[in-house]
Curated annotation (Swiss-Prot):
Keyword hit for Calcium: no
Record's function text: Component of the argonaute siRNA chaperone (ARC) complex which is required for histone H3K9 methylation, heterochromatin assembly and siRNA generation. The ARC complex contains mostly double-stranded siRNA. Inhibits the release of the siRNA passenger strand from ago1 together with arb2. Inhibits the slicer activity of ago1. Required for swi6 localization to the centromeric repeats.
InterPro entries, per database record: Arb1
Taxonomic lineage from the root: Eukaryota, Fungi, Dikarya, Ascomycota, Taphrinomycotina
Keyword Cytoplasm: yes
Subunit description: Component of the argonaute siRNA chaperone (ARC) complex composed of ago1, arb1 and arb2. Interacts with ago1.
Keywords recorded for this protein, A-Z: Cytoplasm, Nucleus, RNA-mediated gene silencing
Gene Ontology molecular function: any one: endoribonuclease inhibitor activity
Cellular compartments annotated: Nucleus; Cytoplasm
GO cellular component: ARC complex; cytoplasm; cytosol; nucleus
The organism's place on the tree of life at top rank: Eukaryota
Protein name from the UniProt record: Argonaute-binding protein 1
Length: 399
């Protein structure tokens, strides 16, 4: 897998391709048959491939000899790997293809002529091996370094968040498991022994990613938290008085939207339009909550600046407030590796007061993209959170 190869626009067959049906067929039970007998798909969370037989080890030594270029070895391995997994889930297929593409592997269809055409009597697994090929540009190593960990890190951070658009926890888990499953199989079959340490590091990163991405997903639904929402309702123009209008005023408003279904008109759930003092604050609710939690000092202040920033969490310190368990979260302004532009700001360090339970499962080094409002009394308000990003977040450098 090559560092920096964000998109492979090749449409033809570049590099060597191998039809695995040309190898001598094993007389013993194949790995695929043994897996089928065990009733496994190959995608179980803690799946382990069966120990290789002596015959399989010998075949692997032939297929993946270090005398063969790594690009050819990886092409051969990917072909066999695809045939030994069940691909009934379209999300898994899409993510695996995106992962390969990021690493410089282009997926396409073989062209057949003469005696190499598909044997219609072949088993489905053999037909798949004949028809689907993953290609790696033959000269890719002239321009890029091999770095399995880099590819895993970029794929499981910026790529799945902004290119794949994953939002469900289940899909985030699938993405991490795909990378880990694939790399463990590379190790198991001794495809790239010269990169063993790098591949093991990539496997560990995939495990770390699964924990962080799920934690970050849950945190993103809770931020900016009750206190910051209350502060925004007092100080930030976009939120001031947003929930002050009473329900009776809303129903009499000529612009109110009704939902029509089966010729019956009705109002959306009234609770959605009422301030609850938790995620939606009227001005009075916000003032009361801030007074109880922080004291009167934080009710005043003038906005001096507002910026959208990407920041990195560097520390969390518990604060001594009697009515609420709070912490001071310290962030530094941070530009992701590989980002196109540096942030145009004179800010370097931010301090935000948050409920301590929000960050219980958040590790230092986690990144946020959000809108910050700065007051003349030194208070910083995190009024909008756009994304919570993992510690290993990285983007792809422009070519």
């Amino acid at each position: 897998m090559a560092e920096g190869d964000f998109k492979n626009d090749s449409t033809g067959c570049i590099g060597d391709s191998v039809e695995f049906t040309t190898f001598k067929k094993r007389t013993g039970k194949s790995l695929g048959n043994r897996r089928k007998k065990r009733g496994l798909s190959g995608w179980e969370p803690y799946f382990q491939e069966p120990e290789l037989t002596a015959e399989e080890k010998l075949e692997n030594e032939t297929l993946y000899s270090r005398n063969i270029p790594l690009t050819v070895r990886m092409e051969r391995f990917i072909q066999r790997y695809r045939s030994r997994r069940k691909w009934s889930d379209p999300t898994r297929i899409r993510l695996f293809t995106m992962y390969l593409d990021l690493g410089g592997v282009s997926t396409g269809q073989k062209q057949f002529t003469g005696g190499t055409d598909i044997n219609n009597d072949a088993k489905a697994r053999e037909v798949s091996a004949q028809t689907t090929t993953d290609y790696i540009e033959y000269d890719i190593l002239d321009e890029y370094d091999i770095d399995f960990k880099w590819v895993a890190g970029v794929f499981l951070s910026s790529h799945i968040l902004y290119n794949a658009g994953l939002t469900k926890e289940e899909d985030l888990q699938i993405a991490c498991q795909i990378v880990r499953n694939f790399l463990l199989s590379v190790l198991h079959n001794n495809v790239a022994p010269e990169f063993e340490d790098n591949i093991r590091d990539a496997c560990l990163l995939a495990e770390q990613a699964e924990t962080e991405l799920i934690s970050n997903k849950r945190l993103s639904t809770k931020l900016p938290g009750r206190l910051q929402r209350a502060l925004a309702s007092i100080h930030v123009d976009n939120y001031k008085g947003l929930w002050d209008k009473s329900q009776s005023d809303r129903t009499s408003d000529s612009s109110v939207n009704f939902i029509e279904s089966n010729n019956t008109k009705f109002m959306p759930n009234d609770e959605l339009f009422e301030p609850d003092g938790i995620s939606r604050f009227s001005t009075q609710q916000a003032r009361d909550y801030i007074q109880r939690t922080l004291g009167p000092r934080y009710l005043t202040g003038k906005v001096v600046e507002q910026e959208y920033l990407t920041v990195k969490l560097v520390s969390k310190t518990l604060l001594n407030f009697s009515n609420q368990s709070l912490c001071k979260a310290v962030f530094i302004v941070w530009d992701p590796p590989g980002s196109k532009y540096s942030q145009d700001t004179n800010k370097e360090r931010l301090e935000v007061i948050l409920e301590s339970d929000l960050l219980n499962n958040t590790v230092d080094g986690t990144h946020l993209e959000g809108s910050f409002t700065f007051l003349d009394n030194g208070l910083t308000i995190l009024d909008t959170v756009l994304a919570v990003l993992p510690t290993f977040y990285e983007e792809v450098k422009d070519e």
